[in-house]
Amino acid sequence: MASGAAQNSSQMACDSEIPGFLDAFLQDFPAPLSLESPLPWKVPGTVLSQEEVEAELIELALGFLGSRNAPPSFAVAVTHEAISQLLQTDLSEFKRLPEQEEEEEEEEEEKALVTLLDAKGLARSFFNCLWKVCSQWQKQVPLTAQAPQWQWLVSIHAIRNTRRKMEDRHVSLPAFNHLFGLSDSVHRAYFAVFDGHGGVDAARYASVHVHTNASHQPELRTNPAAALKEAFRLTDEMFLQKAKRERLQSGTTGVCALIAGAALHVAWLGDSQVILVQQGRVVKLMEPHKPERQDEKARIEALGGFVSLMDCWRVNGTLAVSRAIGDVFQKPYVSGEADAASRELTGSEDYLLLACDGFFDVVPHHEVTGLVHGHLLRHKGNGMRIAEELVAVARDRGSHDNITVMVVFLREPLELLEGGVQGTGDAQADVGSQDLSTGLSELEISNTSQRS
């Protein structure tokens, strides 16, 4: 079973940090926020739909608590408790009346189906729920906030590169169960990379909502791959509604990996990719969606669209991806339906690598193992900065795109040196590009290496 081990020493250090964090927090915020008090963290837009509230407040909470260096396990637990309390209240007081605008009648009918809530009011109410929970926990921190966390070494690096804007986003969520209050015996960890185009809105939205939507799928426990597929579909549907309301035109490809017990489940849209390395050999888990793929080309043409070769293969002469969240004006040719696959883990797996096309367009799969092994040799088994080196390789090879690389070690990096590089070719997994489950802020450079 490929999973990190809970580290008691790390947890003891975390436990000792919680009282100090609570004391400092309540000293800075001695009372709930009044209506006149400035909000201590950026509000996610002006309005939220009912379906968006939980995910957006989770993002707000984790960003705010992270900025105050809250212990990670505590941040997840207090976020879950505060949001649970807020969602049990009547949110109708935050309902926003639609603005009076001259709109097409059809658009007005569509808007009427969505209840919009005031984001600023929700954020203020949530901060007060957070304050209330922290006040209660200052007296007695519950065991759930001190529960041992599974340890993962995750190396992440992202750069804007030569592009004007950074449109990539990524998610590293080893405490998936704790964040969503899942109490079964299956440990779950979630990792994702989203590669936006035409703006950052879609990538940011997907990085906030896909895992929250997945957590609510009934199939999460019985068919996780199907749950991930549905989470992508639902996120696309929600973002399209937002895009029509706010006149957004962006889209995003994406890839995610959910480790659930002794199984790995992946889902993807577009050309962001994930590979698994096992005993020094690349295991191909997926086939990226590209317009030149014969099945994708046939699907697009059957809908009345076309695929043409310009500087690269493009859908309807515009987008270089055939599936994505968003891209409201290219639906249904650019599909929001993800593919998914599953694989049992044996404990012999080395690491996962998730990356956008800014990396994989210039670094083929079969070169990854050699690059990682060389880095570990030079750094005596320390994998903390491996993602940074992989990004540098892609940049030096001429990638001009945003580049994001995430390496999730499934074994201690030092152990990987003992066997050497056993193979550099691709091994085809027993999963393909179909569902076989039954067989952070916009920064130019983001570097994260963590035990989480």
Curated annotation (Swiss-Prot):
Q: Which InterPro entries match?
A: PP2C, PP2C_BS, PPM-type-like_dom_sf, PPM-type_phosphatase-like_dom
Catalyzed reactions per annotation = O-phospho-L-seryl-[protein] + H2O = L-seryl-[protein] + phosphate; O-phospho-L-threonyl-[protein] + H2O = L-threonyl-[protein] + phosphate
Q: Which residues carry this modification: Phosphoserine?
A: S452
Which SUPFAM superfamilies does this one have?
PP2C-like
Q: Which Pfam families match?
A: PP2C (PF00481)
GO MF term set: calmodulin-dependent protein phosphatase activity; metal ion binding; protein serine/threonine phosphatase activity; protein tyrosine/serine/threonine phosphatase activity
Return the cofactor note field. Binds 2 magnesium or manganese ions per subunit.
Sites binding Mn(2+) 2 sit at: D195, D357, D401
Q: What does this protein do?
A: Dephosphorylates and concomitantly deactivates CaM-kinase II activated upon autophosphorylation, and CaM-kinases IV and I activated upon phosphorylation by CaM-kinase kinase. Promotes apoptosis.
Cofactor dependency: Mg(2+); Mn(2+)
Q: Which residues cross the membrane?
A: none
Which stretches make up the PPM-type phosphatase domain? 153-410
Tell me the protein's name. Answer: Protein phosphatase 1F
Tissues in which the UniProt entry reports expression: Expressed in the liver.
What gene makes this protein? Ppm1f
